[in-house]
Amino acid sequence: MNEPIMNAPWQPPAGELPAFVSSQPTIGILIDRVRKVYPARKSSAEVVALDDISLTVPKGSILGVIGRSGAGKSTLIRLINGLDKPSSGRVIVNGVEITALSERDLRTARRSIGMVFQHFNLLSSRTAFGNVALPLEIAGTPKAEIEKRVLPLLDMVGLADKRDRYPAELSGGQKQRVGIARALATEPSVLLSDEATSALDPETTDQILELLKQINRDLHLTILFITHEMAVVKALADRVAVIEGGRIVEDGATFDVFATPRHEVTRRFVSSVTGSGAPDWLLEKLQPQQPPGGQAVLRITFKGSDANQPLLSRVSRDLGVNLNILSGQVEMIAGHPFGTLIVSLDAAPEVLRQVIAQLSAGNNLVEQLGYVA
């Protein structure tokens, strides 16, 4: 039996390629106007799990799909790996329309799609080596080839010394490393991750995310992961898609989505990890109208190189106002600096307008949140 080659997508038998094979060589995953409806059952009404979803994941990139529970994330990943079929639309992976394959061809095509699960899904009766070897055994790979394939994978995920350990003897992070190695056993070109870090502690989560980034760099894998944690998106994704109620409400480059979230759902996700939201103590004091002796409260979002500029001191000097910093932080997102400051100032309306105009220079975004006494 022919084995798939690293990063080489499965192809139908030689001859003229059928219509369902995409001619886009740079696209790893293409989701085209997909709709998934679960029909009504007895007293339950029909459920529209996905509604007109379209996404493109370039080969070798990492896309994070984030949404709340019930948003449609798990349904989406089941359609990509062919465990379920859409009611309409197309799913194309590695140039092959998954939704048009027979069961036999689908089983073959799945070898180019690796899957990492939330709860590891390891067989307790098998060692780390045995769990990683399982998909190769199912594919009929010769024993000698299995040995040559599995040992480097265990070494890649940092478990070369744990090959004979059973799942009960491994930590949560080690179990997930075994799961990642198993997902890579058939040398896929696409890796799907279903909440792979949600059952892990923060330190272990960081280690697993770094491992996934290393795998993406070293093997040039296309990675699509679903999560409900924006911190995971910030750490791992090149691009992000926000799903809500079965629809993509926002998508784009990770930095752009963090820097300028357009949808309310996205803004809530972003504020949970960037500190861009006002702290609770300030929200309790904010007033919509200026009280006697009150100060205006501004939120300034700095993007890219502007995050490193001494803008506050310059505005304070030019306009003769004192800007009091109430909260703020600067961090790196997708390799770019991103900062948020919340300040208060006592200024007449005309001076306040000038302050906002100067602070809005370049890529900065300035919002007036209200007033505090």
From Swiss-Prot:
Topology versus the membrane: Peripheral membrane protein
Gene3D superfamilies named among the record's database cross-references: 3.30.70.260, P-loop containing nucleotide triphosphate hydrolases
Pfam hit, one: NIL
UniProt keyword terms in alphabetical order: Amino-acid transport, ATP-binding, Cell inner membrane, Cell membrane, Membrane, Nucleotide-binding, Translocase, Transport
KW Ubl conjugation (keyword) present: no
Protein name: Methionine import ATP-binding protein MetN 1
Record text on subunit structure and interactions: The complex is composed of two ATP-binding proteins (MetN), two transmembrane proteins (MetI) and a solute-binding protein (MetQ).
Principal location: membrane
PROSITE patterns: ABC_TRANSPORTER_1, ABC_TRANSPORTER_2, METN
UniProt binding sites for ATP: G67, R68, S69, G70, A71, G72, K73, S74
Gene Ontology cellular component annotations, sorted alphabetically: plasma membrane
Signal peptide feature range: none
Similarity field: Belongs to the ABC transporter superfamily. Methionine importer (TC 3.A.1.24) family.
Subcellular localization: Cell inner membrane
Entry annotated with the keyword Nuclease: no
Catalytic function, reaction form: L-methionine(out) + ATP + H2O = L-methionine(in) + ADP + phosphate + H(+); D-methionine(out) + ATP + H2O = D-methionine(in) + ADP + phosphate + H(+)
EC number: 7.4.2.11
InterPro entries, per database record: AAA+_ATPase, ABC_transporter-like_ATP-bd, ABC_transporter-like_CS, ACT-like_dom_sf, MetN_ABC, MetN_ABC_transporter-like, NIL_domain, P-loop_NTPase
Stated role: Part of the ABC transporter complex MetNIQ involved in methionine import. Responsible for energy coupling to the transport system.
All residue ranges annotated as the ABC transporter domain in the record: 29-270
